[in-house]
Amino acid sequence: MKLFGTDGVRGKAGEKLSAQTSMRLAMAAGIYFRKTSATNVILVGKDTRKSGYMIETAIVAGLTAVGYNVLQIGPMPTPAIAFLTENMRCDAGIMISASHNPYYDNGIKFFDSFGNKLDETIEAEIEKIFYDDELIANAQKTMTEIGANKRIDDVIGRYIVQIKNSFPKELNLKNLRVVLDVANGAAYKVAPTVFSELGADVIVINNEPNGSNINQNCGALHPEDLASEVKRLRADIGFAFDGDADRLVVVDENGEVVHGDAILGSLAAFLHEQKALKGGAIVATVMSNAALDDYLKAHKIKLLRSNVGDKYVLEMMKENGINFGGEQSGHVIFNDYAKTGDGLVTSMQVVAMMLKKGKKASEIFGELKPYPQILLNLKITEKKPLDKIEGLKELEASLAKEGIRSLFRYSGTENLIRLLLEGKNQTLVEKRMDEVEKFFVKALNA
């Protein structure tokens, strides 16, 4: 069975992600990282899910069994783990989170000593070790060679300083009213602290994690509460994080949820004006709206498109010497400050842009009007290779002929196919989506 998906290992806690699997995966990772070890220390963090305690304990057992020392830092955002792994000179970092998924799911993702997500070749090597009984048995240490673990509570300050350093020193957030929805997740302490220390009037919602309310009708996937609070409190802006705070959703002062591509476009144009956009280009994914292309062209900025997943965005950014990119879903990467999508860094850049431009959020983000786009997640029973589906090429050609951009791809973690259609005529896009849905229902026995 394949372990790694598009973002680490993910599944239902206690089922696919059991204590046994977690411990063995940690042992396999430990064996791999020992080959290039510099400090013999691995950092482990988690979000606020109840199952995080079980998985954390199993991971610590697995790592110490193969001789690694472990630093446990408790609930912290995913980008904090990436930053602290490098900052604290660890051999690797491990984050226990299923991001925006419900509380009963969990996941394990790894970072190398520089705070980068692992590429697929390394994941494949760890997976190979995971299934090698002899190698795992022989790697287990005894007596004084068994590793030690230490729980540390004071590292949050290092990450807060890093976030504040991404905000222009000549600015402050006095007279700015901000509503934060921390999704009962990993940002529940750090996000309010950062905004308060910079002088904002901060209102926080969904900040009482109990182990099972993470992402529950709140946060980046459910910004409705945030939108109504921003309006009710006459706030200047609202920010919603997901469970591990690597993505951000923005709500303007009118309570309108800002389109993810409008965030990317506006920030790219702002960086370009500030002469801070390297390479005169940004990276977005194949999911991004064609209106983003047109908006960036008007600002003389080039758009490169990667596969879906922030690690692929980052890969393309590195290959092309680009320092800004992201996904429509709210993963935004400022490579000057972070190695992965970071909701807090993004929120800092958004408020800095508002202050420097002297404009309201709605005025800035209203400049990019996305073309009608429909995304449908269709449950399926089998994942046939797309190039083997009869009639699909003809369907794509007929859509293109009508000026409709199409993208069909399987979810890396669930039995779903994601169907995306985009065009300038809403009615036509809706009509064709009905046909596309029926086509895939028949083709994949959904």
Curated annotation (Swiss-Prot):
One of its GO terms (molecular function) is phosphoglucosamine mutase activity. Activated by phosphorylation. The modification Phosphoserine is found at residue 99. InterPro entries: A-D-PHexomutase_a/b/a-I, A-D-PHexomutase_a/b/a-I/II/III, A-D-PHexomutase_a/b/a-II, A-D-PHexomutase_a/b/a-III, A-D-PHexomutase_C, A-D-PHexomutase_C_sf, A-D-PHexomutase_CS, Alpha-D-phosphohexomutase_SF. Mg(2+) binds at residues 99, 242, 244, 246. One of its GO terms (biological process) is peptidoglycan biosynthetic process. CDD domains: GlmM. One of its GO terms (cellular component) is cytosol. Its EC number is 5.4.2.10. The active site is at 99 (phosphoserine intermediate). Its cofactor is Mg(2+). Catalyzes the conversion of glucosamine-6-phosphate to glucosamine-1-phosphate. Belongs to the phosphohexose mutase family. This is Phosphoglucosamine mutase.
